[in-house]
Amino acid sequence: MGMEEWQGVIDDPTKYDIHKANQAAFNLPSRLIAKVFLFRWIYRGSAYAYSKDPDFTPVSKSVDFWQNVIDQYYTKYKKLHATHLNYIKQATTTGIITSPFGREYTFAPKRNKRGDLVWSENDITNWPNQGCGADVMAVARVAAFQRAKRQGLRGLFISTVHDSIVADVEDVEQEAWIKLFDEVFRDLPSLVTQAYGVEWNIPMLGEVSVGPNMLDLTEVKL
């Protein structure tokens, strides 16, 4: 499986806001709704679930409406749809999906409330995607730590939250840390290729926010 199949929803994040584009293309009421819809759709969210979700019912409570939006997304993102179907076929026939980085995911059918054995399409499409992101962030963490150590910075790495690295730094070092994280994410495609031996052809965009805690953050203009 090539990296192009993992590109999925990325058209070219350096050129325009994909969520605003989808908001307009699929006639959705806000950028936030378009963004949340996209990430749930990636994991095979059902039209019925959207029609019952309080975040989406103000838009429409119609299963047909949300199925139409889902179908439009699959029409736009044909390669991702094909990847989903490929994952489901692999998982249900072999029980294993192997990522481009070599990580293996094992699957097995489970009994539902009716006692039937079923395969979870949500898990099958979710795990490889989440794992791919985790493997990329592992490279980012190591690179950031090594660069901070070389520069003699005194800040402390606290945690990773999804695709965000959290560090506790002194005010006097703030500008140095901003520059460090900006450069790490700009270099991340080549660092991923170096770490895993797989050509990474997806542009990476990084954002840096600062503040006294995780709630009160202000994004820095890079």
Predicted regions and their residues:
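Conserved catalytic core of nucleotide polymerization and phosphodiester-bond processing enzymes
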Residues: 1-222
